[in-house]
Amino acid sequence: DFEYFVHQYPVELAYCLALIHARSRYSITPRWVLKNYPVVENIMHMLRGNPCLAGCSYCRHSLDIHGALKRYFNFDSYRKYAEEALQENAVKAAVTNKSILAIFPTGGGKSLTFQVPALMAGENMKALTIVISPLQSLMKDQVDNLEKSGITDAVTINGLLDPIERAKSIERVENGSACVLYIAPESLRSKTIERLLLGRKIARFVIDEAHCFSVWGQDFRPDYMYIADFIKLIQREKQLDDPIPISCFTATAKQKVIGDIKTYFKDRLSVELELFAANTSRTNLHYEVYNNGNDEEKYNVLRNLIESKDCPVIVYTSSTHRAAMLAEQLREDGFDARAYHGKMDVKQKKENQDAFMAGKVRIIVATSAFGMGVDKKDVGMVIHYEISDSLENYVQEAGRAGRDENITADCYVLFNEQDLDKHFTLLNQTRLNQK
């Protein structure tokens, strides 16, 4: 391959060699070079992103996934699931440019599994990894957690940002100081995002909460179905010879959902996803159900549970109205509580999330909008004031507790027969009828 590029693309090869020896870590290939010399991406990938012969000093250091884990996150080893090295194997597969589907339990380290290869690609190839996530709270949480670890290479572009913050994120992607970009699937229809990604070498597309692909999943998101079309557009515009690798992650997936995800990428992009599935349970979670007769009794149980343990608490409700009302009632009774739901003012929602994540507020009363991917290690209690609308959603939401394996966390459901009627009514309201 090297001899071929020497003879056929000497200018592109010379450029890549010069870029490799640039002193600045954030030196990237300008957009006009990518557009006029598309082979540059292939050469850069061959030189810096492909493991080569045994004994190569570059590969031994820069493509060493254990060294990267220690360098970026100061961990000595990858997490095992029932003595299986699934996390390590998934990272290794990504670094060797395979497309994967990883099913890890909540709190099982799935974020680190795609962050290590993304940071390595940014450092080695000046490349950008795009992480597609369904929730704004998840994106912000991930970026904040990386910054706490001293990693400032990630940015997000979403509706929670004001115009100045959005402009700064775009600038950082353009100038190469960001190598990880978190966006929502809806953003893929934006011409700004399209232009932004065409101006960078793309290392990989990561799809978080991949169960949103499947009509069999409770969180089906139609915008996820556009992802393959967008990737195909980027590949065509960049004139790429090889498909951009893809990583899909989810914590809960039925066999039908797994089949849907794999079939989607096989049919749309001719990409085979290698499966990494963990068969393990969360042994540090304690589950209990309280059967309550009326609202007053239920609220008293809620108060008693919160008072019984001094720890961060998430209280889930099924409606925005209930979340706001319950948070206010708890505050009136002397508890440090705030609400979080989809109908809140964007600024207020961001402030409430920040306060809870930083430990300034002990209790967050939320709808499922405060769900997937929220990563606060010390949550010691999750209380469902009303039952979830599916078992899958319950596993996701209860899994917010006890993400630190060294603590024991409690998951309570305050059950009332009337809750089932509420969910049945909501389901009927969303049904399409032909008249």
PLM ranges: what are they?
Residues 1-60:
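N-terminal accessory nucleic-acid engagement/regulatory domains that precede
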Residues 3, 7-11, 77, 89, ...:
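Intrinsically disordered, low-complexity Ser/Thr/Pro-rich tracts
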Residues 45-74, 85-89, 95-101, 105-111, ...:
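Helicase motor core with emphasis on the C-terminal RecA-like subdomain
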Residues 81-83:
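Conserved SAM-binding loop and adjacent beta-strand
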Residues 130:
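ABC nucleotide-binding domain signature
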